[in-house]
Amino acid sequence: MNYKMMGRFIAQILTIEGVFMLPAWILGLVFGETTAMWSFVYTIAAIAVTVLILNLLCRGAPSAFYAKEGLVCVGISWIVLSLFGCLPFWISREIPAFIDAFFEIVSGFSTTGSSILNDVEALSKCLIYWRSFSHWLGGMGVLVFLLAFTGEKGKGFTMHLLRAESPGPDVGKLVPKMRATASILYIIYIGMTVLNVVFLLLGKMPLFDAVCTAFGTTGTGGFGIKNDSMASYSPYLQNVTTVFMLLCGINFSCYYLLLLGKLRSVFRDEELRLYVGIVLSAIVLIVLNLSGFYDTLEETIRHAAFTVATLISSTGFATTDFDLWPSFSKSILMVLMLIGACAGSTGGGLKVARLMLLLKSLGRNIQQTLRPRRVQLVRNNGNPVDEKILANTNAYLAAYVIIIFVSFVLISLDGFSITTNFTAVLACFNNMGPGLEAVGPTCNFSAFSTFSKLVLCFDMLAGRLEIFPILILFTRETWLHK
């Protein structure tokens, strides 16, 4: 294990975090929020000291960097980012309990959007900004940001890190160099964010609100800056957010292909077509089920479309209390929470690509049972899928199910209902945000015990990092062997 290389890398990640805290510190100065502003000063100072120590201890690090280091580095980096990222909330005492501050920022970086806050609007503006920015940074990935804007280092450095942090069953190159791929993804991501801000400003949303909302939308994080999330905003602003949530649930590679003029490749993409089909089907079924629930058809369609978009993209904004909807509609929403967005997007969940591969693999197994001598390949977009990817998908599904049920049992010690516990785990592990009943869109996670909050923090990080970069931190083999 190349510990020195990992230490230097974590120092770079912390440096980026410290730099990104500067705008929040400036906002604290502008708004005269003295206590909150100084909390950022102390945090940045703590980061600077830690970075200095790591750089001194890790001088002369070997350049070799392999898959195991990549996975471990990603897992540790996100934990360290969260430990330092929560300090402004805790030092300012705006979130007095450290575990609550840690839960809040883990929810931010993992783009979950679950909160322990009873009154979001009581937070200082600079802390609201940092809270919202955390899930924008976590959306595409802080490590992807580092790869996009620094040089390549060491053997396999970029590929191992991008593979470990990127969502989906496989990491593909848009261009030959992985650094260039990371740069393209971030440029598209920034462009989507700016475009989202512009459309929100056209709807007369205040600039601060527009920026924070765009962070939550493009990062599919869903931290609202108002206690009612998006409910108090105009229908236009809600519709704009619906569109951008759905767009950010699409594989970002599709946008690169669009920029290259490869429209046919985009429209023939099987995952995209399945994603669109699921979205449209869910909206139609929920609208039919909600007949008479709202005053007008327009309101019904708007809330149905927004809620479908917020859950399948794993954003977590809300315009209505969907916990009051009929059971059929809530069942559809739970299915969307499980499926999630497309691979290569900023969304969470199992991913549409994995669902597609699992269904095709199941179909192949049925055919082979009926015709044992028949050789049949699983194909995606006309190309054969590597058997290793199928095996990894099956392993991911097994780990996915096990973690959900173990977490469900563990947090059940708090005595909440089965629905509350199950949807709380689904919301955190799939990076959704709200669940049902006691963790519904008008509630929060503050009532859970410290132990349950730690379990849910594990779920949020494991869900965002596709399980294994977090899971391997708890295995002996990771630390015993070279």
Tell me what each language-model feature is:
Residues 1-482:
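Membrane-proximal intracellular helices of multi-pass ion channels
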